[in-house]
A protein has these predicted regions:
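Membrane-embedded transmembrane alpha-helical bundles that form the catalytic cores
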Residues: 1-465
């Protein structure tokens, strides 16, 4: 069930909120758990048991790890829990990738399992992993209430596509959280910002990108239009979902971590990945990079650790060689910055912005490709090596049609709109006008977005496949 869908907006969410707020405090987590299981079962009923198995093993091993803390058995239980989590993830997400790779390399014909990817498995697996690891490290107490832990792992606002919420971030709020009209209003506003990003921007850029993929009239201009459209689509799609998730969390009394901080204003790839999908980046830092030694064991080991983390990041995004290459793409850029480029980029920030946007754009062309050959072909065409004409009538038509929206998208991907609103609020008169108009800022995107949804317009969600 997509957040940007009629069933969610007008049936599931109102019913879930009504029952949740009507329930007594001691039953709210149980209501959340049931609502989350229903939400998951709506789109993936056959894999709901898989998520429950992941929750049960995390709950049981968490208790055993805490019970035997400071003993060898604690590490054994941690290892078993990690193996179960990664085993489930590996089997359902990577088995066919492994088999097809073996077939291609060895010339075999091993039968593929042809498993469909369980929705959200990459996200809830990482939450269970962080929970048992934090219990082992003594950074959080094991949760003895199964319903509370299950509600944390399956919490529907962030179940499908994050942010990746660590147990320690919400442990206190699972036990006791406050609800208020102002918090709910804040949540509604944040949700509608994300909804507008998704329906009014991401979907429109996605439609333009899909036109390029289906056209026979290619040109250098059209490839660049596609690349820019996809760059904006993936940002507004994913950051919009994160905004909706954070907003839903506030409605329910939770504070989820921020996931995006205007990544396209970055002046280096290093800065970009501190601003993009921040909950995933911090997860890999704390649970893989630092345990591998981080930067504590010399420069060579640090560079190796970066390479390992980015191979894992690529694979986390998808079971395909294009994602492995995408991870390597950013690993190489980060290594080059670590070795030599960062001082230059920090000194010349304008150059840094151009460099970052250029290489991030090429990276996301690879991210979106069905094969390495397709990515090379598209990138080659962008650089003028594909033998394509510089322009075409179709490319010019779509540039004129989508030009204003592309400019709007570029501006909205910067802090400029937020800065303008903040400046207006310093004026008493302007602030009063904004307060009066605020309901319209919520209602208009809802009406426009609903019109698009009812019309059956283009409405995919990119990160559901992870």
């Amino acid at each position: 069930m997509l957040f940007s869908s009629v069933p969610f907006l007008f049936y599931f969410l109102p019913a879930a909120l009504l029952i949740y707020f009507a329930a007594p405090r001691q039953l709210k987590n149980a209501v959340l758990l049931l609502a989350s299981l229903f939400f998951y079962a709506w789109g993936e009923p056959k894999y709901m048991l898989l998520m429950l198995v992941s929750i049960v093993q995390g709950y049981g091993f968490g208790l055993l790890i805490e019970k035997h803390r400071e003993q060898k058995a604690s590490k054994v239980f941690l290892t078993l829990s990690i193996l179960v989590s990664l085993g489930l993830l590996g089997y359902f997400k990577y088995a066919d990738f492994f088999l097809s790779s073996v077939n291609a390399v060895a010339g075999l014909s091993l039968p593929l399992l042809k498993l469909s990817l369980p929705i959200g498995i990459s996200f809830y697996t990482f939450q269970v992993l962080s929970y048992v690891i934090d219990v082992y490290r003594g950074e959080t107490a094991a949760q003895r209430n199964f319903i509370d832990l299950a509600a944390y792992v399956s919490l529907f606002p962030q179940l499908i596509a994050g942010p990746i919420v660590r147990y320690s971030d919400v442990a206190a709020e699972l036990k006791s959280r406050t609800h208020s009209v102002s918090a709910a209003a804040e949540g509604v506003r944040r949700f509608m910002v994300g909804f507008a990003k998704k329906i009014l921007l991401a979907n429109q850029f996605g439609a333009l990108a899909s036109v390029y993929k289906s056209t026979q009239d290619a040109s250098v201009l059209f490839v660049w239009l596609y690349a820019l459209a996809f760059l904006l689509q993936v940002y507004f799609d994913f950051s919009g979902y994160s905004d909706m998730a954070i907003g839903l969390g506030r409605m329910l009394g939770f504070h989820f971590p921020e996931n995006f901080n205007y990544p396209y204003i970055s002046a280096s790839i290093t800065e970009f990945w501190r601003r993009w999908h921040m909950s995933l980046g911090s997860w890999f830092r704390d649970y893989l990079y630092i345990p591998l030694g981080g930067s504590r064991k010399g420069k060579a080991r640090q560079l190796l650790n970066i390479l390992i983390v980015w191979l894992a990041t690529g694979l986390w995004h998808g079971a395909a060689w294009t994602f492995v290459l995408w991870g390597l793409w950013f690993a190489v850029l980060l290594l080059l910055e670590k070795l030599a480029l960062l001082p230059v980029l920090e000194k010349h920030r304008v150059l840094g912005h151009v460099y970052t946007l250029f290489f991030v754009t090429l990276g996301f062309v690879l991210f979106d490709a069905d094969s390495a050959a397709q990515a090379v072909s598209r990138i080659g065409a962008m650089l003028g090596a594909g033998g394509l004409p510089l322009s075409s009538a179709q490319a010019v038509y779509y540039l004129k049609s989508y030009g204003p929206l592309l400019v709007l998208g570029i501006l909205c991907a910067t802090p400029l709109p937020k800065m303008i609103v903040a400046k207006l609020r310093k004026s008493k008169g302007a602030a009063t006008v904004l307060d009066v108009l605020e309901p319209l800022f919520v209602l208009i995107p809802l009406l426009l977005g609903t019109a698009f949804l009812v019309d059956g317009s283009f409405n995919p969600f990119l990160y559901f496949r992870f």
